[in-house]
Amino acid sequence: MLIVADDLSGAADCAIGFANAGRRTVVALGADEAVEAANDAAADRVAVIALDTDSRRLAPADAASRAAQAWRALGGTQGANASAGVGVGTSQRRLYKKIDSTLRGNWVAEVAALQPLAGLAIVAPAFPATGRTVRDGRVFVRGVPLGETETWQLEHAGKTADLQPMLEEAGLRTALFAVEPMRDLQPDLLAQALAEHARAGVQALIVDAQSEADLNLIARATLVLREVLHEAFFWVGSGGLARELAALPELFGNDAPAPVAPLRREGPILTLVGSLSAVSGAQCALLRERTGMAELVVPPAVLRNVDSHPESAQWRAAIGAPLAAGSDLLVRIGRDDAFDPSEGAHLSTALAALVEPHVCHLAGLIATGGETARAMLSQAGIGSLELLSEVEPGVAVAQPSDDVRRLTVVTKAGAFGSDHALYGAWLHLRGLQEATRNGSQADSQRAAHASRAPETNSPLN
């Protein structure tokens, strides 16, 4: 299985279902790491590869090119047409194009580039476990139309959030597919209905899904579509459909490689938050309330010119001091009147540069926002991750593939997760969940006390 994602947290939250199902799963941050993982897959050492193309902020044409190149290089396609980039080839590997459940990024251009190579795009971005559903080709976030949400208004104000016109604008022939009236059908009959759309020339089939049961039905039908009807297609979805696929034992052989065992670590935990969403803000507030850990809010003005700003050295030292002393720390990007969503990658890279000298002290890293996680791992020289488990849906736990850093990493998309997501991640890394289940309050209190440090928001106070 090859998962092609446009950011790191998305790659992880999509692929984690396969690790949970007992399949060894690697997230690669670049082409070289992905090729190495593909070689491991060919040698039956890896079952699932999730490649972060880092294309969310690129121009649509560049993002499309990266997605197509990834499939050509890693898809295992056979035949002259596939190798020439013309027509649909026969692939030894299944393709899952991961998209954001709130439709951020260049996913339309990427799907349009992949469709001629991989066949029918089965588009199902619903993720009911996180409140994302699809009805009549429209995404809803906890019952609210996507176009009316904070996330959409922040990044896409004035643009349509409906799936069908978005895909048709890219030149794809589309159709809507409602699962609700077909819920009583067996997967083989549902697969026949899917195949009819493919044979009618549909290039992107938009699938409604209100529940995990709907996604499970689609997952089972698509296996029939491939294995029995031999239709060429690829999945386009979020972590929701991926989890249902991962739960199907027939997707992999019985001898598929299993995940590696996690290694226990001791030391401070850094929570790094690049997202400015209200969701992340609430998660940070609860984390501080429950743990009492120190928080540093780095001004964007420092990050915009981190190499030359006169206060950069002070911020770097302020980040390092509590970590060197063994205390946990929350660091996040501030917001000012000059804020522009397009500068997110630059600010995240600058923040990672301030943190990098202190990574050696860390036992755990919690990174919120795909750009933030990728920037921090790149600065630390980590090119791929082995997925281990998850704290809650969409919050993945991993460790570096080579484990040179001896670091446990938790990744989460910014506007994602419950209010307890960051606190739950911290508890997971501290090992408090097991202690709490066993009623060991003394252990919990000792671990919590170890995280406390004097509260501060600026090294300049």
Protein language model regions, located:
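N-terminal basic/disordered segments at the start of proteins
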Residues: 1-44, 124-129
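Conserved, well-ordered active-site substructure
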Residues: 368-424
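Short beta-strand segments
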Residues: 4, 50-52, 97-98, 122-127, ...
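Cap/lid and interdomain-hinge subdomains that line or gate substrate/regulatory clefts
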Residues: 24-28, 60-63, 68-79, 90-95, ...
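C-terminal structural cap/anchor segments
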Residues: 322-373
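Short acidic, glycine/serine/threonine-rich loops at helix termini
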Residues: 14-16, 106-110, 132-140, 189, ...
